[in-house]
């Protein structure tokens, strides 16, 4: 990609790690966590989840890093079961869609409240749409129909309706 400094490389990507404030702690609006992980799993790169983050573990980098690295037994694994299920689903989707791991990236729509891009490889096209606002939005992509990878529903993709803070992933075989 012309915008990419490391063209052809598969770089390691993360939203938090042992050196920075945990993602769930950093977010003022916790509803945005789903967008964060969906972007991590669908953008170019190799996604990495720092242990405990799949369960919404919190940790602030104050005087030292100890709060960022709790004993795994101390992480509340039932805090956000919806987040854990969502990340498991993203793992399965990424494994089943080669375009998400190796495909080219192309921006479709970009604003400060929502965005849509596509990943494409060998006849597989994945549309990734995100709404980070508290308002309903509709994204136009000019495509016939595709399969919603999160629900399995087959639908028309001309207008993708995005409720507040939502993620939609669609596969279009071309």
Locations of the language-model features?
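Solvent-exposed beta-hairpin/edge-strand motifs
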Residues: 142-152
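C-terminal beta-strand-rich structural cap/linker in extracellular carbohydrate-active enzymes
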Residues: 156-174
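Loop/helix patches that line or flank the sugar-binding groove of alpha-linked glycan CAZymes
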Residues: 1-143, 162-164
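Short, solvent-exposed coil/turn elements at secondary-structure transition points
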Residues: 54, 78, 152-153, 173
